[in-house]
Amino acid sequence: MAQNKRLIFKVNGLEKDYGSYQALKVKKLEIHPGTIYGIIGTVGSGKSTLLNILAGIDKESSGTVLYEDNPYETNWLGRIKVHDDIFFSKAPSFNRSGGTVEQYIAAKFNKKKNVIQNRYFKDGSFKNLWTRNMKEISVGEMNWLGMILACETDPRVLLIDDYGTYFNSNMEKDFRNKITGMNRTLGTTIILSAPSDIYIKHFASVLIYLDHGHIWKIRPGISKNRNPGQRNDKKKYTKGKNRNRKRNPRRK
């Protein structure tokens, strides 16, 4: 009997409701290790909700979400225990920090603080960000800071929401090189979301398109740097009441 391929995330019958509003309904989704995924969808498509659930920040209303074949554990208060080897670029801990950016990075990276300062905060428009309070920086600056921490933390699984939304072309190319380098040299599993595939399609192996909380299409990206072991799914979903799905065989 052939062995089942190891998965990072396995999602079955996932639903997420906020009162009477259903934000997400995903019948099945499998995330393979060492692969770069792009989740594409406009505002309200459910992409941020999906990342929050995968990160362990939010809990599904029904269905199962497994991380390496195990469900997320909760503490005695019912709060989800977040895995240390999963990094989410929009983790709530950023907003709860009351110190400066310098203090936050010093506490998180210790001796590596000076390296990070010279690498990202030495020149340019972000130089003054170093001494500002975390609670006072803008959404765009917080997004950029989350990207820096994502690249410097070296997690096993990296989740990035709203990739490229607040970047100019040079910033996007710089972070793209860092992300693909992590994937290529360290085997990091990376899941990024964006309202458009304009950037992500060039380096993601798998593109997942969401619409009103449903997956309606999955196709391979156009990346030329895929790992040999990556398996790319290409599935097309037809719209309609029953959302009948036609599945093509998996391709390596």
Segments from the language model and where they lie:
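Helix-to-loop junction immediately C-terminal to a conserved catalytic motif
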Residues: 55
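Conserved ABC transporter NBD signature motif
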Residues: 63-74, 82
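Q-loop/switch helix immediately C-terminal to the Walker
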Residues: 92, 97-112
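H-loop/switch region of ABC-family ATPase nucleotide-binding domains
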Residues: 193-195
